């Protein structure tokens, strides 16, 4: 009969702290791994954020302007959405069109939308 995960969890749950410590050490020796916590960088301070150049941008449709139909067409082309979804985005401005894009792509999207008559922000 094979041991199930539930059996292992039940056995580990009944161990004392000292027994768990010994178990962790045995895992480290047997498999050549370390149970040390991985250091995670905290949030950068305001000064560090300014010094580091932003690499990902969000393109936000601020308003559709007078040429809504043209803006809807461009939004559909950029996002690949259907007509109704693109219209809902344009009607619900301000809305994010694309997230996490490169600066060049964000500027290209901004140019396309502005040529169609929209007002666009890059964040």
Curated annotation (Swiss-Prot):
It comes from the Bacteria. CDD domains: Ribosomal_L7_L12. Transmembrane segments: none annotated. Gene3D superfamilies: 3.30.1390.10, Single helix bin. GO terms for cellular component: cytosolic large ribosomal subunit. The keyword Cell division does not apply. Keywords: Ribonucleoprotein, Ribosomal protein. GO terms for biological process: translation. One of its GO terms (molecular function) is mRNA binding. SUPFAM superfamilies: ClpS-like, Ribosomal protein L7/12, oligomerisation (N-terminal) domain. The keyword Ribosomal protein applies. InterPro entries: Ribosomal_bL12, Ribosomal_bL12_C, Ribosomal_bL12_C/ClpS-like, Ribosomal_bL12_oligo, Ribosomal_bL12_oligo_N_sf. Pfam families: Ribosomal_L12, Ribosomal_L12_N. Homodimer. Part of the ribosomal stalk of the 50S ribosomal subunit. Forms a multimeric L10(L12)X complex, where L10 forms an elongated spine to which 2 to 4 L12 dimers bind in a sequential fashion. Binds GTP-bound translation factors. Belongs to the bacterial ribosomal protein bL12 family. PANTHER family: 39S RIBOSOMAL PROTEIN L12 (PTHR45987), LARGE RIBOSOMAL SUBUNIT PROTEIN BL12M (PTHR45987:SF4). Forms part of the ribosomal stalk which helps the ribosome interact with GTP-bound translation factors. Is thus essential for accurate translation. This is Large ribosomal subunit protein bL12. It comes from Neisseria meningitidis serogroup B / serotype 15 (strain H44/76). The lineage of its organism: Bacteria, Pseudomonadati, Pseudomonadota, Betaproteobacteria, Neisseriales.
